[in-house]
Amino acid sequence: MSEIRIRRDVIFSGENPLVMLYRPGTDVPVAVASYWRCSFSAAGAGEALVIWIDPDASGLGDRSPIGIFTDNGAMAHLVWETFNRHFDRLQGHGIEQVTIAPARFTQQSDGMRLHRVACSFGVTTIELEWRNALDVFHTVTTPEVGGSQWEVSNVVCPCADAGIRVDGVPVIGEVHQPEGMYRSSAFLAFAESWVRIG
């Protein structure tokens, strides 16, 4: 019988897809969206979107959302303070200065072809869309984030294309691939668990 390894300091379990778009033909980011769908955390379940969009380069101007939108403020605070604020692409954009805003979420999926999340707050709707997954694989990594050591496991689908729309207006930007350990700047991440190991 194989040995069962038990780790108890589970901080987050759920989903954490990402979309990062670049100014076409460059390495300059114009939008970063980190979506969290939490099944378990010490702060409870819920959904959160941490997002930054460059108002000028994206073509959205004053429509560009910057901040954290959620249906569980405590959970959103947990993922921001513990994880997202240490991600260099989300630093220096004033996200930490914005009040966490209440939002509603819907999700639509069509296997490897399409995955869509809509985040609505007030009269505004942000849509994230991942298209044409290129692969599916399981990973286990042990990164250091925020001064803690973690074991992170997930099922990843790097995507060929992705987009962000705000009230139907698309961000002007493109996905880069290959990029990073997940081989695309837009990927789905399911069955994701963050366990503190040090």
State each model region's role.
Residues M1-G198:
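Targeting-peptide/extracellular-domain and disordered-appendage signature
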